[in-house]
Amino acid sequence: MTLPKDFELYTRNIMGEKLYEAFCQGLSEEAPTSIRINPFKVDADNIIIGNGNELVPWCKYGHYLSGRPPFTFDPMLHSGAYYVQEASSMFIDHVVRQTFGSEPINVLDLCAAPGGKSTCAMSALPEGSMLFSNEPIRPRAMVLAENITKFGKNNMVVTNNYPADYKKAKMVFDAIIADVPCSGEGMFRKDEGAIAEWSTDNVEKCRNLQREIVSDIWSCLKPGGIMVYSTCTFNAHEDEENAEWIAKELGADFIEVETAKEWNITPALCGNLPAYRFIPGISKGEGLFMTILRKHGDTGKADIQRDLLKAAEKRLKIIANGIKAPEIKGKQIIPDHSEAMSIMRDKAKYPTVDIDYTQAIAYLRHEAITLDAAAPRGIVLLTYKDV
């Protein structure tokens, strides 16, 4: 792998020779494969997906696999039993459990596509919490909506808006997850296109865009509320420097979370702040920077869920919110796919037929399948391994 010269010079300098050598070695190795179990749909303690069962230590439901199975051909993936997610990004699970408290809260995941951090955070949030999962780019928002629908949890709303739209809507949240767009240095191992697109000019553009995004959304975080700021890049301009800029210019204090030495998380490379860096060759995952800030001010009140929904319905583009209304064709009522995916569906409404692997794959290919003659007539809910 040939890295851009400017990137190599800067990164070697900020990491130091020993860390940089380990980092380069990590980039030459195959990226680990990891998944996260959906605890709302399956028994997380007993389900087995793929080969190997090494736990991701900073995520309650995260697992490393010994290889990369053909996920596309696993009906359990399509039913939302698990989510294929890079292990470092699962650190949000640990952060939520450590800092978000034990009472139901309202959270905004600002730059959420494709949905890994949203669904991971929701698995860790106190029951009764609500999460708005937002993505401003329409095609990415549709992928996000598909993954949130598949996850099946209630109290998750998908929107297609820019941070300024939330600001205009005057919505206030207890916590905001800001996994901001970045120069993508943490994706070098997985995507050679990220190397080709990298430049010092792009780093500068990303740094400025990140500040704009956080500034636009800051009024939507209640006084005393928590912001999780993260990127998938390594340079300090987008990471430590921006985090310190948020604290100084917008008004916030840093929060430290406990970690274990064996997790091999690297602290801040510059400045005096608690930060959590996942570096290939050091920690088992891709590149990630994360830090946690608490907004200045006496602990304020976030909007109640009912008011958040009212504001969203009036001022935002909601593209998914629980079970969609059925389609009516003449005298026939056709349920929406979201009803089949939801854990809140009325299980007595439609009879259930559990199908085998061959039938499930045929269904996923949009092929007609034939059920047993004893199967109920009319609309039935198809499951695979009872999911």
Describe each model-derived feature in a short phrase.
Residues 1-46, 284-289, 296-387:
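Polybasic, low-complexity RNA-engagement segments
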Residues 33-94:
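Conserved AdoMet
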Residues 103-113:
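Conserved class I S-adenosyl-L-methionine
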Residues 107, 128-134:
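Short beta-strand element of Class I
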Residues 114-127:
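Conserved SAM-binding loop of SAM-dependent methyltransferases across substrates and taxa
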Residues 136-171, 178:
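S-adenosyl-L-methionine
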Residues 139, 174-215, 228, 232-240:
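Mobile active-site "lid"/loop adjacent to the S-adenosyl-L-methionine
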Residues 219-346:
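Substrate-binding/catalytic lobe of Class I Rossmann-like enzymes that use SAM or dcSAM, i.e.
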